[in-house]
Amino acid sequence: MQNQNPVELIEYELTTFIRRAVYLDQSEKRTGNLERSSYLLLRQLDEFGPARVKELAESFKLDISTLSRQAAALEAKELIYRFSDPSDGRVSLFTITKLGKQLLKADQQKRLERYEQMLKEWSTQEKEMFGELLQRMNKAFID
């Protein structure tokens, strides 16, 4: 792939990266006990606090019905808690529970260890640059 258009290179590498990440997430080599969707939902609630289903669905670019199913599964496992919005009792908010925080923290630690291992040959500057570029790419997907 020498002398390749940079955008072609990015497209190919991103496609390959996503395929490998999904494989690892679904294989016996999976990092942690939480499924990717559960991990992301718990992480969102932990980082940004209570949220409505609609807000969460918009954040992840999912149908409300899909997000509702994911939330219901986490609620059944007591990893998140539903309560009435104090400003509008007709609306429910979700928040992460203590158990949810514990499982999230354990999974996050395993994920960080895996990434530390994968990036062990990278300099701090390379990791920072890659993180910044990934943030920009993620933002470009939703803009």
From Swiss-Prot:
Q: Which residues bind DNA?
A: 53-76
* SUPFAM superfamilies associated with the record: Winged helix' DNA-binding domain
The record ties this protein, via Pfam families, to: MarR
GO biological process annotations for this chain's record?
A: regulation of DNA-templated transcription; response to stress
The alphabetical list of record keywords is: DNA-binding, Transcription, Transcription regulation
Mind telling me what this protein is named?
Uncharacterized HTH-type transcriptional regulator YxaD
Instruction: Please give the superkingdom of this protein's source.
Output: Bacteria
Question: SMART domains per the record?
Answer: HTH_MARR
Name the species this protein comes from: Bacillus subtilis (strain 168)
List the Gene Ontology MF annotations in alphabetical order: DNA binding; DNA-binding transcription factor activity
**Residue ranges of the HTH marR-type domain?**
11-139
